[in-house]
Every structure is written in structure tokens, then in C-alpha cells.
């Protein structure tokens, strides 16, 4: 049989400021000149779950080109510590910054950030704050936060359409959120 196939990622727990974070590092393929590493900045909520397989496929493709990829589940997501409702933008930014530091400490350095949807916004913010990351790859970046939030809330509306007493508008959900109430959207 020829070829070993794709290399399995190195899976480990990265220490975040509030607990252990699931991390998977896809190193550059053996025999390929290393070009450095990128950090994947995932999309938000259900979009993150729907993109997991694609992110792994892309990380393997980058590996074949000599680019390592670190995928981190921020606090309260995936297999990381915490509950989703406890996560904040600031917390997730800190968690991804810990990923950048991990890449720097392990020799190849962080040459770029790869962000998908709302993760693209996070990647741009991280790059500006860090000041030393030369490359950004932004897939389908969110350009209008209000529109994104409305689309996100529509997931909940769709789930309640058949219920007579269900929430019927994104305005109702916005009012709950503005009052400090948690709004469950999709589980």
C-alpha cells in the first residue's frame, strides 16, 4: 500500500484562563518544508458545529502545503471547559490568544489567522491587538453584526413555528436578551 494518508492531529488540552481548552494541532506533513502555522478562529455557535468537518479537511490540506494549523475550542464550546452561556467575546479572544502563544512557544511561530464568519471578525481583532501576525485568511466574514444577529435568532423562530404559544419574532428574542435573560437558540 502506498502513502500513509493524512496525518492525525495532535490532540491536547490547552490551559485557558478559565479552564482546559480542547485543541488539535495539524502539523506540516512529514517531508514538506514547514512554512509556519496558522490559528483557526471558528465561527459562532451552531455555525461552529456545522464547520468542524470542513475545518479539519482544510487543516489537512494546509498541512500538505507545509502549514500547520491549530484548532482551539474556546471556553464553553465543543469539548472545552465551561458552558456556552458563560462564554464572552473577551473570553474567547483570550482563549485564541493563548493558541497564538502556544504556536509561538512550539517553534514555528504564528504566521497567520484563519477566521470563518464571526471568527473572521475575531481574527482581525486579534491581528490588530497582537501587531505581529502578518497574514489573515477570512472566509465569509460577517460584515453586518445586526443582520448576523437577526439571522442567528431566526434559528429559534424556525424551531417554534409549529407551537401555538411559541416566540414569533426576533424582536421578542431581542427584548429578552436586552433584559438580561439568556436566549436559547439551538440547544
Question: What are the residue ranges of the model-derived segments?
Answer:
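Alpha/beta-hydrolase active-site loop signature
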Residues: 45, 74-79, 143
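Gly/Ala-rich beta-loop-alpha elbow adjacent to hydrolase catalytic centers
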Residues: 114-123, 140
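The alpha/beta-hydrolase serine catalytic core
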Residues: 132-187
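An N-terminal hydrophobic leader/cap segment in hydrolases
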Residues: 1-31
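Catalytic nucleophile-loop/oxyanion-hole region of alpha/beta-hydrolase
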Residues: 77-110
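Active-site signature of alpha/beta-hydrolase-fold catalytic machinery across serine-
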Residues: 125-129
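Short, surface-exposed "cap/lid" segments of acyl-processing enzymes
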Residues: 18, 26-73
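Structural motif
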Residues: 36-39, 112, 135
